[in-house]
């Protein structure tokens, strides 16, 4: 089970090492290498880490941070339902690495690799494929590999998202506008044929249909843009600042692309975007937490795995 990654600790050095690995990947930033690496090393890695320390400390919790903690908890639950089948975790960037995961299952003949990204994007699932290929090249093992590209229409996944919305008190006692906020990607990547935006739209539409929501009760936005280039729109933060002027004062935000809560959901959505919405005149902002290590999520993962075990 593979997630994106996280610094080893909420300190400047750990954040810098993580960002260097993450932002050096051409899958993440597709600019001429000489230009981008100069910007990265001379500017970004000097300026960004000190600014991110407080943000990471805000969401960190226990020693391993939310992504690693929750991913490991999810893996433990999945493992409890398939005794005899080793379930290990890896991160595309940071620790535990893909190579470390392969070492843990070195005696296996067949491996199911499940990136925890329901919607395929070259910058996420594609990067997992790259990391896997590199780890396999450096491994002495020979494995049959089953790779799960995406599961954005999986019925259990759609139902689990809908149930998480239905459990919200704000949804049960009101008529909030439901906002599906997905991590954005540069528009240029989408224009080059990345299926990600269409898969995001499909997931959101399926959940809205499952909830019997008319089109004027939900919307889709994209968050976490980085740098000056145009990313997928509409932007979540800009939308939050504009909704109260459109007469929408009650929103319920869910982030279907994030399998577990992390900096981008806890700090960016639950705190920053809430502040933007309320400052603009909004009255109630509710964040629906990620599926995390819930049993609903566990059963989705188990069903995906079982299809590959047959």
Labelled PLM ranges:
Residues 1-310:
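Active-site-proximal alpha-helix that buttresses catalytic centers in soluble enzyme cores
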């Amino acid at each position: 089970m593979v997630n994106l990654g996280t610094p080893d600790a909420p300190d400047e050095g750990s954040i810098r090492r993580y960002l260097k690995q993450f932002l050096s990947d051409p899958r993440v930033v597709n600019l001429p290498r000489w230009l981008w690496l100069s910007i990265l090393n001379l500017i970004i890695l000097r300026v960004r880490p000190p600014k991110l320390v407080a943000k990471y400390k805000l969401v960190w919790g226990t020693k391993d941070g939310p992504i690693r903690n929750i991913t490991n908890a999810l893996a433990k639950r999945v493992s409890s339902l398939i005794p005899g089948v080793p379930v290990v975790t890896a991160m595309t960037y940071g620790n535990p690495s893909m190579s470390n995961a392969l070492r843990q299952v070195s005696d296996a003949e067949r491996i199911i690799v499940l990136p925890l990204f329901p919607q395929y994007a070259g910058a996420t699932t594609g990067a997992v494929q790259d990391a896997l290929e590199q780890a396999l090249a450096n491994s002495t093992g020979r494995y049959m590999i089953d790779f799960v590209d995406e599961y954005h229409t999986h019925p259990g996944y759609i139902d689990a998202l809908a149930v998480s919305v239905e459990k919200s008190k704000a949804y049960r006692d009101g008529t909030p506008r439901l906002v599906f906020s997905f991590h954005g990607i540069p528009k240029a990547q989408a224009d080059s044929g990345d299926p990600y935006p269409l898969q995001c739209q499909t997931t959101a539409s399926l959940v809205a249909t499952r909830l019997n929501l008319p089109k004027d009760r939900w919307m889709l936005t994209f968050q976490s843009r980085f740098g000056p280039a145009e990313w997928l729109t509409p932007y979540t933060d800009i939308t939050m600042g504009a909704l109260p002027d459109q007469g929408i004062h009650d929103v319920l935000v869910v982030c279907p692309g994030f399998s577990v809560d992390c900096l981008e959901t806890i700090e960016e959505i639950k705190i920053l975007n809430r502040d933007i919405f309320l400052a603009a005149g909004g009255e109630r902002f509710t964040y629906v937490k990620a599926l995390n290590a819930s049993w609903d999520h566990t059963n989705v993962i188990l069903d995906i795995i079982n299809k590959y075990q047959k």
